[in-house]
Amino acid sequence: AYGVVEIKQGHGTFISSASNKRLFDPQLFQILIQDRDYISLTQVRHLLEEGLVKLVIQSATDEELILLDQKMNEFVEVLANNGSSAKEAARLDLEYHRMLGRICHNSIVENIYVFVIDLFTKTINPIHEGVDTVHQRLHSAIMNRDIAQAVDAVHEHTEIWKQAYQATKK
């Protein structure tokens, strides 16, 4: 519940303690309760991802990139299997993005990024046309530690989100 409460299965729901890693932030809570402007959220996500991929390329260890590569391979395998569900692909997509947050080695960026990604959870559809290709481009750029290509892929990905959103408004 975004750091406000902790749910402990079998024990109940409790107000989060100060030791909680994702402390409640009134500004983030304001985003939750206001009407969501998808275009504004997309702009925020774009800014965060552009900076995030730079941090990942600069900070991730080779071992972390191997784990990221394994996660991408799982995602690609699910997308290649026509019988796979969009739900499973979306789950792996989210895991990949959360892993990017972890391996940027900046807990503030990670927490904000994961928060923003969670706001997009219901709209994520990795089966949209072009999404798999742009994910592969972004991943390849990260694996090659190529900041310019990674930033280009983030821009391309953002355009796909905007187009998909516009298509739902028609």
Predicted regions and their residues:
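Short amphipathic alpha-helical segments at helix-loop
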Residues: F29-I33, N81, I142
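Conserved amphipathic alpha-helical segments that form helical-bundle/coiled-coil interaction surfaces
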Residues: L41-A141, Q149-A164, T168
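Short linear motifs at protein or domain termini
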Residues: A1-L47, K54, Q58, K170
